[in-house]
């Protein structure tokens, strides 16, 4: 203290430091829409192109209602010129009064546009191939023809008071100058958004980011992105597109679509809740993902993949002893996703030779038995020994524990643990099976 007995000033800040989400958007990405994105669900358009898919009218309506309840912003439907029933289904879904806007996906052709605007849709998604592959082997038109057709269709759809998106097809194998010229042309006449499509799944995140940033410099409208998953980059590409400034992402339930599909709805939600938790939790009913995936899986006769983000049957299961110990102390040690956000539970898989004594101790507590730590370590060794010989199940482990306990002179029971609301880890291991369908 100074001689004049004055108080010294406090130089350090007394306010709590502001912490940023380390898994969120990079602050340098000033165009990022990671916290302001929209979803266009294409299960009833792209998903219909999945090899196993056949959705009758009733099933389409059921899926559309489920997606609307989940909170998607748009629902995209098969072109009404694809078949007579496709047109009728489009009209039927438009009459449901859903909160989500209804889109249909058409070729860049006036014949398609005239039919589309009569169905009652809120918007029309127009697409035409721009790569040399598609111009030569698909529609056979040059860029001048594409630009002229695009302007004609866009102006017609706009005259009907309907949203319009123009997208190139096979964007990442198209000439960049051609792409930017066509996008500038359609932006000038007032499209609601332009679309980038990785039609063959060839793009990587760095290419996506660079193209989106370049496109943002030449158009003022929103950017929509459609990523196929042929090389396994669909989720990463979608996230990177949002970082670069795209706003809308095409998804489908379980990623179903042409070949091995597109960005999956559930998988993207897993990525986005880590990056923008408040936005995602407030906008989407995440606990509905499991039901929607089961609905679509049943409709197309597939199982939920075991390694599916969120709903794979092992998504929140912990097996190794080191992992189990840490999870029992603090789930964040080995989980970036909270299963409760999705209406799921976490499990400790203790019936195996990799188990640790902390997991067995938790099981002993559940069985209301009284063992010391040293005794638990001893019984754990017995469990691991049998686990070296054959696969174990919960009954095997419980029998070993109970037999061990019966041989001791300690009290048979300890006071019953009534539990608390914080008991959120199930170590029963009962859900682990070879069945890949997630059930409640």
Curated annotation (Swiss-Prot):
Q: Where is this region: Disordered?
A: 1-27
Bias class Polar residues marks the residues at: 1-23
* Domain of life the protein comes from: Eukaryota
Example of a GO biological process term: lysine biosynthetic process via aminoadipic acid
Mark the residues carrying the PTM Phosphoserine: 399
**EC code(s) of this entry:** 2.3.3.14
Phosphothreonine modifications at: 410
Q: Name one GO cellular component term.
A: nucleus
Q: Which reaction does it catalyse?
A: acetyl-CoA + 2-oxoglutarate + H2O = (2R)-homocitrate + CoA + H(+)
**Any one GO MF annotation of this record:** homocitrate synthase activity
The positions annotated for binding 2-oxoglutarate are 45, 105, 165, 199
Q: Where are the transmembrane segments?
A: none
Task: Tell me which residues bind Mg(2+).
Answer: 46, 226, 228
Identify the Gene3D superfamilies for this entry. Answer: 1.10.238.260, Aldolase class I
Per the record, the pathway is: Amino-acid biosynthesis; L-lysine biosynthesis via AAA pathway; L-alpha-aminoadipate from 2-oxoglutarate: step 1/5
Subcellular location, record wording = Mitochondrion
What positions does the domain Pyruvate carboxyltransferase occupy? 37-290
Q: Which UniProt keywords apply?
A: Amino-acid biosynthesis, Lysine biosynthesis, Magnesium, Manganese, Metal-binding, Mitochondrion, Phosphoprotein, Transferase, Transit peptide
Q: Which cofactor does it need?
A: Mg(2+); Mn(2+)
Q: What else is known?
A: Present with 21900 molecules/cell in log phase SD medium.
Assigned protein family: Belongs to the alpha-IPM synthase/homocitrate synthase family. Homocitrate synthase LYS20/LYS21 subfamily.
Protein name listed in UniProt:
Homocitrate synthase, mitochondrial
Name of the gene this protein is made from: LYS21
């Amino acid at each position: 203290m100074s001689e004049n007995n004055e108080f010294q000033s406090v130089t350090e800040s007394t306010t709590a430091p502001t912490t940023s989400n380390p898994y969120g958007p990079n602050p340098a990405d000033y165009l990022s829409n990671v916290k302001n994105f929209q979803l266009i669900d294409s299960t009833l358009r792209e998903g219909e192109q999945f090899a196993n898919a056949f959705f009758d009218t009733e099933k389409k309506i059921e899926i559309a209602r489920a997606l609307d309840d989940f909170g998607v912003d748009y629902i995209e439907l098969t072109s009404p010129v694809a078949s007579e029933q496709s047109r009728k289904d489009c009209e039927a879904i438009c009459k449901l009064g859903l909160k989500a806007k209804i889109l249909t996906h058409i070729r860049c052709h006036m014949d398609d546009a005239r039919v589309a605007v009569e169905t009652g849709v809120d918007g029309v998604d127009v697409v035409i191939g721009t790569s040399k592959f598609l111009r030569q082997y698909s529609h056979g038109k040059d860029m001048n023809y594409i630009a002229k057709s695009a302007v004609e269709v866009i102006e017609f759809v706009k005259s009907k008071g309907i949203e319009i998106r123009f997208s190139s097809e096979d964007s990442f194998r198209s000439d960049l100058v051609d792409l930017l010229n066509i996008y500038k042309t359609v932006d000038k006449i007032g499209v609601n958004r332009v679309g980038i499509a990785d039609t063959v799944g060839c793009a990587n995140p760095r290419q996506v980011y660079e193209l989106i940033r370049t496109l943002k410099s030449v158009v003022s409208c929103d950017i929509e992105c459609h990523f196929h998953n042929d090389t396994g980059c669909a989720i990463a590409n979608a996230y990177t597109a949002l970082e670069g400034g795209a706003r809308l992402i095409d998804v489908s339930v379980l990623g179903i679509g042409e070949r091995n599909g597109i960005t999956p709805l559930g998988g993207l939600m897993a990525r986005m809740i880590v990056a923008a938790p408040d936005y995602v939790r407030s906008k989407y009913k995440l606990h509905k993902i499991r039901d929607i995936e089961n609905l679509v899986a049943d409709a197309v006769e597939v199982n939920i993949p075991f390694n599916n983000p969120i709903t794979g049957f092992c998504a929140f299961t912990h097996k190794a002893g080191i992992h189990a110990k840490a999870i029992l102390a603090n789930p964040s040690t080995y989980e970036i996703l909270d299963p409760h956000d999705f209406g799921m539970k976490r499990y400790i898989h203790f019936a195996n030779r990799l188990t640790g004594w902390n997991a067995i101790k938790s099981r002993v507590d559940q069985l209301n038995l009284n063992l010391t730590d040293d005794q638990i370590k001893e019984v754990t060794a017995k469990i691991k020994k049998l686990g070296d010989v054959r696969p174990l199940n919960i009954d095997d482990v419980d029998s070993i524990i109970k037999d061990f306990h019966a041989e001791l002179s300690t009290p048979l029971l300890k006071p019953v643990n009534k539990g608390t609301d914080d008991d959120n880890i199930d170590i029963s291991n009962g859900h682990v099976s070879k069945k890949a369908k997630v059930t409640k």
